[in-house]
């Protein structure tokens, strides 16, 4: 199984846009279309279910503001299930594959040495979006977004990776995308970026 590209996200960060940009660059993401609040999520629904079935937090349900503490047995079972799904489903000529998921799941993926792509947006904008969509309240969403971004910073410091600010993409600044593609060993294509954006 090739090294995964993990698109680490928090809610309402425009992570589906980033996943679509990677898909437009030829990265396999599962081709399991699902709409959420009117947009395509570009999230592998099969892997999402595998992950949800195997990976559990110590308390509550994910997404949850804690670093996962997993047994070696759980990690091995998760990795074996991923490998089986990838081998059974992904085209043999496809070299790169991605998974878009909450950064809380990092410890489940860490042993696979993923390319770490951290998707960021202003925490206040995320909280406002969550509040306006009536998904949750502003204060809780703001706190959760900041916790996740701090966790992303710690992961990057220890394991490497690239941040992509989706506000920059919307405003026409693709530098973060360029750096992410270079980091993942993918040839950058600006047309693939532009075609993913709906303005």
Where in the sequence are the language-model features?
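Short, well-ordered loop/turn elements at secondary-structure boundaries
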Residues: 1-2, 12, 92-94, 111-113
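PAPS-dependent sulfotransferase catalytic core
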Residues: 1-81, 199
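Proline- and acidic/polar-enriched loop/turn elements at helix boundaries
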Residues: 33-35, 166, 192-193
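Glycine-rich phosphate-binding loop used to anchor ATP phosphates in small-molecule kinases
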Residues: 74-111
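PAPS-dependent sulfotransferase catalytic domain
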Residues: 96-189
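C-terminal accessory extensions appended to soluble enzyme cores
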Residues: 190-199
């Amino acid at each position: 199984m090739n090294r995964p590209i993990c698109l680490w996200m928090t809610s309402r960060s425009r992570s589906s846009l980033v996943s679509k940009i990677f898909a437009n660059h030829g990265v396999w993401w599962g081709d399991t279309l699902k709409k959420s609040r009117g947009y395509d999520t570009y999230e592998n629904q099969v892997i999402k279910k595998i992950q949800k079935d195997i990976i559990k937090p110590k308390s509550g349900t994910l997404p949850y503001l804690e670093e996962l503490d997993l047994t070696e047995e759980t990690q091995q079972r998760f990795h074996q299930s991923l490998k089986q799904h990838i081998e059974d489903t992904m085209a043999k000529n496809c070299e790169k594959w991605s998974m878009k998921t909450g950064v809380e799941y990092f410890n489940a993926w860490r042993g696979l040495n993923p390319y770490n792509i951290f998707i960021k947006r202003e925490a206040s904008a995320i909280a406002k979006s969550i509040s306006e969509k009536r998904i949750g309240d502003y204060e809780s969403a703001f706190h959760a977004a900041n916790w996740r971004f701090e966790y992303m910073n710690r992961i990057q410091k220890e394991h490497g990776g690239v941040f992509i600010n989706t506000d920059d993409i919307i405003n026409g600044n693709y530098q973060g995308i360029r750096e992410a593609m270079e980091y993942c060993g993918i040839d950058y294509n600006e047309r693939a970026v532009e075609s993913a954006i709906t303005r």
